[in-house]
Swiss-Prot record:
This is DNA ligase. GO terms for molecular function: DNA binding; DNA ligase (NAD+) activity; metal ion binding. The lineage of its organism: Bacteria, Pseudomonadati, Pseudomonadota, Gammaproteobacteria, Alteromonadales. Belongs to the NAD-dependent DNA ligase family. LigA subfamily. DNA ligase that catalyzes the formation of phosphodiester linkages between 5'-phosphoryl and 3'-hydroxyl groups in double-stranded DNA using NAD as a coenzyme and as the energy source for the reaction. It is essential for DNA replication and repair of damaged DNA. GO terms for biological process: DNA repair; DNA replication.
Length: 685
């Protein structure tokens, strides 16, 4: 914009006739100074002068509220807090990146790229440890912003994004497209993170563990005033959707980033184009060396093929572009003291040793505990309580003990002894031959496994108790209304009104759903029991093979291995489960409570025309539930797999079928649409 004299903006007389013009001039000036400060790093007025301009605009907007424009800098902080975040479907999927963890990984990626498109140069930039954000501008004005979410659907965080001062509410200049989507990373600089935790510490509030969590939590505040106080920052790293698509854009990724900067969007000052592979490695090493000195947390660098035409030729796989990769930094390591070991019991009964550590800051977070995995890992490390240990954050996420420092072992160091009995229920802890993990044999009886076991029992693919969500299960157990799956069927509507936010109508509906769930199938019942490594398909195969629960309960490991897709390990799990008295008591209680299923007739060869065939489902089915389609195909003898291969007999492609359809066509696999599937199922009903 052409500069307007500061004195003029501060002193011009304002009347109802010229108020709109003056307010627009003030907004335009303040937005330009924001860009000069946050993007160009070249402020042209002092902070006090900026504040005087802002105060004048605020006073005028108070006098003439009907003249407030959408891109006014005063509109960065919204009014009332939101009740919830709306969902936004991305105009173009926001994909994640594949990772390289060493030179061999990156070299393999480089070879894949050059084999397809020849020599390339890379646009390299730090991999910010924040939250991916999509920002949509229409006619240059910020219209909406969303999180990445699952890549297809994110959450509407428009009001919160507006509070980030480095993000322009209106783009600079006039050479931008009519509609442009900007993608980038919202993050919390280290200094802002430290200040945030200092304030929390002074108020005796819970501290954030790292800047990434702080940034994510700040962007997901329903009240944008809280976000505004968190001092978030943003760097743009890519263009998304551009309309019209004929709008002239730069031909390289680096030049497109410069276009974004010219429109007033901040980009990292560490971006560099590397024409040679040696330059890429030098860039990686340079950023790694300077990592701790940067103003923000990073966990690697991102390498993108610079030429846009080459990017388009390389294309995408299901979840990531073929032309970019995140080259991750090695995990950071620190030394600390092993003060003790606790043993935790998970849903499947796994007894896991957890190291209690003297707190140490490593990889951007304070670590006070780490998993020791199992007895084999303890033996491999030769670790004892009292040892000095080396902690690494693998992939900068999971803390783990990688070694001990033998020369620092005190005379008082003690062995780590695995418990013979479950620390929760007292049942025997057993370790099956060939397994590294020790497990509580209490199954559904063990209190530690109870919540997760009952959540699984009631879940959609198990007994499918409509309305029995995780929070309801947790309340039922916490209030001691339920101690085993069979107790679910003793619940009454009046009992369930004791739960939070559960009125009589909801309780009556849930009671009806519980009653309806008594009628199930043997396959669903077996899956609901939560037997280790027995998923839907295995449960269905067991039900079809044995036809009755009584036959399955007494089956030997040898008999179990005769079942399709059941190997020796799964057979051991099943036999072991039915050998535990506590588990049999729970099953008998469920039968006594009225859980039942229709008798299974052994299928004839004529009833299984798809026996021996492998089918795959992909895309959206409009007339048939995906699980129902899978079950009906299995009933006809088909094996339903999750991926397409040369062994696939048929792919059922619903709407928006993606990479699986392309692969099936490439391999010459038969493809069937939903109508053809329905016709097949109807013909064999």
């Amino acid at each position: 914009m052409q500069d307007i004299q500061l004195d003029t903006l501060l002193s011009e007389d304002v009347t109802p006739e010229n108020a709109s013009q003056v307010m627009q001039a003030l907004s335009q000036s303040l937005n330009e100074h924001n860009i000069r400060y946050y993007v160009d790093d070249a402020p042209s007025i002092t902070d006090s002068e900026y504040d005087r301009l802002m105060q004048r605009l605020l006073k005028l907007e108070a006098l003439y509220p009907h003249l407030i424009v959408a891109d006014s800098p005063t509109q960065r902080v919204g009014g009332l807090a939101l009740a919830k975040f709306d969902q936004i479907t991305h105009l173009k999927p926001m994909l994640s990146l594949d990772n390289a963890f060493d030179e061999a990984d990156f070299s393999a990626f480089h070879k894949r790229v050059t084999d397809k498109v020849g020599e390339v140069s890379f646009c390299c930039e730090p991999k910010l440890d924040g939250l991916a954000v999509s920002i949509l501008y229409r006619h240059g004005v910020l219209e909406r912003a969303a999180t990445r979410g699952d890549g297809s659907v994110g959450e509407d965080i428009t009001e919160n994004v507006k509070t980030i001062k480095s993000i322009p509410l209106k783009l600079r200049g006039n050479d931008f497209p009519e509609l442009v989507e900007v993608r980038g990373e919202a993050f919390m600089p280290k200094a802002a993170f430290e200040a945030l935790n200092d304030r929390a510490r002074a108020k005796d509030e819970k501290l954030f563990v790292n800047p990434r969590n702080a940034a994510a939590g700040s962007l997901r505040q329903l009240d944008s005033k809280i976000t505004a106080a968190r001092s978030l920052a943003f760097y743009a790293y890519a263009l998304g959707v551009v309309e019209p698509d004929s709008h002239p854009l730069a031909k390289t990724h680096f030049e497109q980033l410069q276009q974004l900067k010219s429109w007033g969007l901040p980009i990292s000052s560490e971006i560099k184009v590397c024409a040679e592979l040696s330059q890429v490695y030098d860039y990686y090493k340079d950023i790694l060396t300077r990592r701790s000195d940067l103003a923000f947390e990073i966990d690697g660098v991102v390498m993108k093929v610079n030429d846009i035409a080459q990017q388009q030729r390389l294309g995408f796989v299901a979840k990531s572009p073929r032309w970019a990769i995140a080259y991750k930094f090695p995990a950071q390591e620190e030394m600390t003291l092993l003060e003790g070991v606790d043993f935790q019991v998970g849903r499947t009964g796994a007894v896991t040793p957890v190291a209690r550590l003297k707190p140490v800051f490593v990889g951007g977070v304070t670590v006070s505990n780490a998993t020791l995995h199992n007895a084999d890992e303890i033996a491999r490390l030769g670790i004892k309580v009292g040892d000095t240990v080396i902690i690494r954050r693998a992939g900068d996420v999971i803390p783990q003990i990688v070694a001990i420092v033998p020369e620092r072992r005190p005379e008082t160091a003690t062995d780590i002894v695995f418990p013979h009995n479950c620390p929760v229920c007292g049942s025997l802890v057993e370790r099956l031959e060939g397994e590294a993990v020790a497990r509580c044999s209490g199954g559904l009886f063990c209190e530690a496994q109870r919540k997760e076991a009952i959540k699984h029992f009631a879940s959609r693919k198990a007994l499918d108790i409509d309305g029995m969500g995780d929070k309801v299960v947790e309340q039922l157990i916490d209030k001691e209304l339920v101690q085993s799956p069979a107790d679910l069927f003793k619940l009454t509507a009046s009992m369930m009104t004791m739960l939070d936010r559960m009125g009589m109508k909801s309780a009556t509906n849930l009671a009806a759903a519980i009653e309806a769930a008594k009628t199930t199938t043997l396959a669903r019942f077996l899956y609901a029991l939560g037997i280790r490594e027995v998923g839907e398909a295995t449960a269905a195969n067991l039900a079809a093979h044995f036809a009755s629960l009584d036959a399955l309960r007494v089956a030997t490991v040898e008999q179990l291995t005769e079942v399709e897709d059941v190997g020796a390990v799964v057979a051991q799990h099943v036999a072991h489960f039915f050998a535990q008295p506590h588990n049999l008591e729970v099953i008998d209680a469920l039968i006594a409570a009225g859980v039942h299923w229709p008798a299974i007739e052994a299928p004839s060869a004529d009833a299984q025309p798809l026996k021996g065939q492998t089918w795959v489902l992909t895309g959206t089915l409009n007339q048939l539930n995906r699980n129902d389609a899978k079950a009906q195909l299995q009933a006809l003898g088909a094996k339903v797999a999750g991926s397409v291969s040369k062994n696939t007999d048929c792919l059922v492609a619903g709407e928006a079928a993606g990479s699986k359809l392309a692969k099936a066509q490439e391999l010459g696999v038969k493809v069937m649409d939903e109508d053809e599937l329905l016709a097949l199922l109807a013909a064999n009903a």
